[in-house]
């Protein structure tokens, strides 16, 4: 797979201190309904094909902000007089549903995309957003581009690593691979889980496998070398150290294939698990628990790594097939969202987003989002290579099967790493 040169959605380590996401509450939607609960499929055709609808329709995949987005719609109409209809999502196929709407000329005015692959596939539907008033206050590496046009505005930044309970362990107990492995073993001896993974594809293998790729001097070239058979990840130090961590989990803990995301986060919130490999988005689940301990996000310490993985989970886009007046309404909405006092309050406080606009401050970030913000400000970040360099669909189609086989059989760690390598070679040639 050759890297797509026309698409840029890279969070590089050049993020400045002024820059502060899901992941992963980003479930898709097989159903789309308006704010009144009626089905909107086919109801927005007057907003496509060049005819004005006179209102803004929004469709996006972050389910955790749906209710707040409906509240925002009410406030936006009060301030501007423009109606906003928020389409509901449920299920796990938001992107396919979006493509169906677009191809049938019933697409929303404003929508979200979550990877360079999606941006490339949907490029024909993406309006040029270069004239938005606030773009010069966002780091250029956060902005989605296609054919040198600005086509996507970042919602937020998100980061993942070792989410750990500061009351149970200190960061110096997990700052090297050997120390982390020993901590996992010690926790097992005490009847606790040291490092929790869960059965979902991204949380079982996708995100944790990002780190050894991101630590390479040139991740894009490294991936290409893997695809070309010049490198086998089983022979590379960073992957071998990750293998040691997987082996410690396999030998000392409950099988992660038997653990759901909710259970994994719940066990951490109740002190049964010392660490989970997760991101700042998981903090929202802790509101259901009486969490009374300090927590933070530490780097996955393979090969001396001191950085957490930070990236852009989703970007806002405007439908170029909408009428000229509706496209302007969509742009006006984004300008308001990122420059008005009300919009900033929703982004930082009600959505809980880490701000990406220079000068936009968040006074009430939760501890995990604050840890991500601090890492960005300090420059201690590595990119999300799975969004840019990996073959589309490899995590859910291939890598999760490798991990499931590893945790459910007598497959050795070396065999596991070689199987992962083979999956990359196979997926890129499909």
Indicate residue ranges for each PLM-predicted region.
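Conserved N-terminal structural module of periplasmic/extracytoplasmic solute-binding proteins
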Residues: 9, 24-118, 304, 325, ...
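Extracytoplasmic/periplasmic substrate-recognition and gating elements
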Residues: 57, 74, 79, 288-350
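Extracytoplasmic "Venus flytrap"/periplasmic binding protein-like
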Residues: 75-138, 151, 166-175, 274-275, ...
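A structural signal for short loop-to-beta-strand junctions that line the ligand-binding cleft
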Residues: 101, 108-109, 133-167, 193-197, ...
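Hinge/lid segment of periplasmic solute-binding proteins
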Residues: 114-161, 172, 179-182, 189-190, ...
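C-terminal capping/gating helix-and-loop segments adjacent to ligand/active sites or protein-protein/ligand interfaces
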Residues: 145, 349-356, 371-429
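Extracytoplasmic/periplasmic solute-binding protein
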Residues: 151-155, 160, 181-231, 273
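Glycine-centered hinge/linker elements that transmit conformational signals in sensory
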Residues: 227-258
